[in-house]
Design a protein with these regions (language model features):
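A short alpha/beta connector and helix-capping loop motif
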Residues: 73-91, 95-100
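Short hydrophobic beta-strand that contains or immediately precedes a catalytic carboxylate
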Residues: 60-62
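Sec/Tat signal peptide C-region and signal peptidase I cleavage site
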Residues: 23-29
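Short acidic, Gly/Ser-rich segments with clustered Asp/Glu that frequently serve as metal-coordination loops
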Residues: 65-71
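Active-site-adjacent betaalpha module
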Residues: 29-58, 86, 105-218
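Bacterial N-terminal signal peptides that target proteins for export
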Residues: 2-14
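Bacterial N-terminal signal peptides
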Residues: 12-22
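A cross-domain feature marking catalytic cores of carbohydrate-active enzymes
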Residues: 64, 100-103, 177
């Protein structure tokens, strides 16, 4: 009897111990992959009118070369060219600095004709971050640039990297949403959201449209 009683008590103790381990075990937190379908799309940001002085402002045209901006691989880039061309015209009238970038393996003649650079316009060639391994930072510093209008493709490549790089260097960033593009809508949406919410970048970024930008105002 005593032996059976001891075994019974031991069994109960072991059972209680096991239950404690079960309840004490940390619960694995759900990851973004687990909850992917629960993500709610943020409300669209409000676009703002932007008035910029000619002095201290530059227009960046990123990777409008035919290798990446074409009807087959990125038709949304081609569709953005008329709006960017109009903005470029305003930039030329205001005589502000216009800087171009190219992807590796391309050259100035590959840029969309409507956006063709003029002699003397700076052109840099690099990967997505146009500051990395180029003279872009020096070009902007030499002209005392305080604000850059960033246009180009891809939104989730050259635009987000270069705009963030400018903001983190203390340069204000203006993003005309009709002047950036990607293969589909989501990367463009994500890029806008990121630039308006990322630490240190958000406070330096304004989102607008090309026809809401005035250049040459005090």
């Amino acid at each position: 009897m005593k032996k059976n009683s001891f075994v019974k008590r031991l069994f109960l103790l072991l059972s209680a111990f096991c239950l404690c381990l079960v309840f004490a075990a940390p619960v694995s937190a759900a990851t973004i992959i687990d909850e992917w379908g629960k993500v709610v799309t943020p409300a669209a940001p409000q676009l703002k009118e932007v008035k910029l002085p000619a002095e201290g402002t530059a227009l960046l045209l990123l990777d409008f070369n035919k290798q990446v901006c074409n009807d087959k691989s990125r038709p949304r880039c081609v569709s953005s060219i008329p709006a960017v061309s109009r903005l470029l015209g305003e930039a030329r009238k205001a005589n502000i600095l216009v800087v171009y970038s190219l992807t590796a393996g391309s050259a100035a003649p590959d840029i969309a004709p409507a956006l063709a650079p003029r002699p003397g316009d700076p052109i840099v060639t690099s990967g997505p971050d146009k500051f990395l391994g180029t003279e872009l930072e020096k070009i902007l510093k030499d002209r005392n640039i305080k604000t850059v209008i960033v246009t180009g493709t891809a939104a989730h490549g050259a635009v987000i990297c270069t705009a963030s790089g400018a903001a983190l260097r203390g340069i204000k960033v203006v993003i005309p949403v009709d002047g950036i593009s990607a293969e589909s809508l989501y990367p463009e949406q994500y890029t806008v959201w990121h630039l308006l919410n990322a630490p240190r970048v958000a406070t330096m970024t304004t989102v607008t449209k090309t026809d809401m930008i005035q250049i040459g105002t005090k």
